Regions:
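Short, well-ordered secondary-structure "scaffold" segments embedded in the functional core
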Residues: 82-85, 95-335
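Short helix-capping and inter-helix turn/linker motifs at the boundaries of alpha-helical repeat units
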Residues: 78-80
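Short alpha-helical segment immediately N-terminal to, or the first helix within
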Residues: 90-92
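Charged, often Cys/His-bearing segments associated with DNA-binding zinc-finger transcription factors
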Residues: 1-76, 334
Length: 335
């Protein structure tokens, strides 16, 4: 897309993009599907995201660099507007564009592209983190229009699952050992993800070393603190959290255990199938996080310090997509 635009770098479309081969003002002229392909969002949602982050009043005052002689941050001067920088960051997240490519596309140095993306990822992560309690939708609010696929779970508040992201082998030997998972045979960081009955993100932890158990993930995160008595939580069998839920008078919906029996009862089969059908939506949500190519394949050591920020930002950005859980049974679900 940007290759075709290179020869038109000075074309006027409301503002001059005299240095950059690519800028937001050019790309917002693209068809909606093309813009979504590169950023994961439509032009309208991009504008809403920019306003949610404070608009130009806040975004124009972000600081990008430290000088060695003073702790005061310095701000870049140049052609890139706040929207250009947000666009650059979304482009890197969604398409996994390298810093060297961003240098060419936006006609800036590689180090500057790195600082812009780093700053915006940290900024968005901190802003989204402020919304965590609001995002954990109450049971009562979900009851107002609970999707019919959850009609058998009247008090269900959150559906949880754990997911891992592959990382480069850490240089620290202890971190390398703790992040290696025998199951996957490579190094990972692990997150607990929870969604509401409407399919939106309710909760996401910081990243933990990949060898952590699901139960330990529950214990070391603040997840249980968000729950109230008589809430319902849905998970798979691996979390081993019955005692934790009992302590807080929380109902736990998990598939039935066979134990030493040879077969499930008919009631248990129906119950387990209902849970399986409902739990698939958290897996769909996690799949949408991994559509962001910067975290999908390999998180390098250079990005490891902000790995939790990367995944959190991608998870929150999924909330800006159209709902994928049908409210009514007749609706078509797009998975």
């Amino acid at each position: 897309m940007w290759v075709k635009e290179m020869g038109k770098a000075t074309r006027s479309i409301g503002i001059q993009c005299t240095r950059s081969y690519l800028c937001y003002e050019k790309c917002k002229q693209l068809p909606e599907e093309e813009f979504r392909f590169y950023t994961g969002r439509t032009q309208e949602v991009f504008e809403l995201l920019h306003e949610l982050l404070g608009g130009d009043e806040v975004c124009a005052n972000l600081k990008y660099d430290f000088k060695k002689k003073t702790p005061k941050r310095t701000q870049f001067q140049g052609d890139l507007s706040p929207k250009d920088k947000l666009f650059m960051t979304l482009l890197r997240l969604r398409r996994g564009i390298t810093l060297n490519d961003l240098k060419i596309i936006f006609q800036i140095s590689e180090s500057r592209a790195s600082k812009i993306c780093y700053t915006w990822i940290r900024f968005m992560s901190l802003e989204f983190k402020k919304l965590e309690k609001l995002m954990f939708v109450s049971r009562e609010n979900q009851d107002r229009r609970r999707p019919k696929c959850f009609k058998d779970f009247k008090n269900l508040r959150v559906i949880i699952d754990a997911t891992e992201f592959r990382i480069q082998k850490p240089t620290n030997q202890q971190q390398s050992s703790n992040s290696f998972t025998d199951y996957k045979s490579y190094h990972t960081i692990k997150f607990l993800v929870g969604i509401s009955c409407f399919g939106g993100l309710s909760f996401i932890t910081e990243g933990f070393e990949g060898s952590i158990s699901d139960r330990k993930l529950i214990e070391d995160s603040a997840f249980m603190d968000y729950l109230e008595p008589h809430d319902g939580v849905m998970s798979d069998k691996g979390f081993d959290m019955e005692d934790k839920c009992d302590e807080r008078e929380v109902d736990l919906y998990i598939p039935s255990f066979l134990g030493r029996r040879s077969a499930f009862t008919g009631r248990e089969l129906i119950y387990s199938r209902a849970i399986a059908v409902s739990r698939i939506f958290v897996e769909v949500f996690i799949g949408k996080i991994k559509e962001f190519r910067l975290v999908r394949f390999l998180i390098t050591n250079s990005m490891l310090p902000v790995a939790s920020d990367l995944v959190r930002v991608c998870a929150f950005l999924v909330n800006f997509q159209k709902p994928f859980i049908p409210i009514d049974e007749e609706e078509t679900r797009e998975l």
